[in-house]
Amino acid sequence: METLTQIAIWNRALGFLGARSIAAEDENTPEALQCRLYWDSARRQALRDYPWAFAQRRAWLARVALPSGFEQEYRFAYALPEACLKAHEVRHEGLLPRPFCLARDPAGDATILLTSASRALLLYTEDVRHCHQFDDLFAHMLARKLACLLAAPLLKSNRQKIAELEQLYSASLPQARQSDASERRPLPLPDS
């Protein structure tokens, strides 16, 4: 089985465009320049579009001061894990789902999570940066997302091709969701 690499995903995206492939990340070509420019954004967007099994994490959250103005809705504030890309669910005592929202801390330096859970377990998508951790289906979806972002600068705003690429990406999401979801069976939550 071929090891997933950043260059392999870049070249797959370039192939979707019908563009020239590249041999190294630091090439001084329009294709390599655009791939470097859009790579992180495409990766984060594709990770946020679905809770991919390989990127799911759980963490007990560390409490921080509740910002003023939220006392009527929430009782507790928590710092998010460092690599948290998207929060999916907060569970009180690790079991019962609780409503939550994200807000800025009073200094405006970080995003915090507000909830009524006194002991909060967060289910979240981690910002996975290393290609060797990606599964094949995600790598394919990421290449499609990257192709969507590369289309305008490399194809000189060919609107028809851009729309086609975005449609292919969107149409592939349900299949990816079905395939990825078939690999997990969550435990039922206890009756309250």
Regions found by a protein language model. Name each.
Residues 1-3, 8-9, 93-192:
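Internal mixed-charge
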Residues 33-106, 134-150, 154:
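Divalent metal-cofactor coordination and adjacent catalytic microenvironments
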Residues 13, 17-21, 46, 50, ...:
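A generic secondary-structure signal for well-formed alpha-helical elements
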Residues 27-46, 160-178:
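Short secondary-structure subsegments characteristic of cysteine-rich extracellular domains
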Residues 1-37, 192:
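Short, extreme N-terminal leader segments that mark the start of a protein/domain
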Residues 25, 54-60, 187-189:
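Short coil/turn segments at secondary-structure boundaries
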Residues 20, 85-89, 111-113:
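Generic detector of short, locally flexible boundary/turn motifs and exposed helical patches
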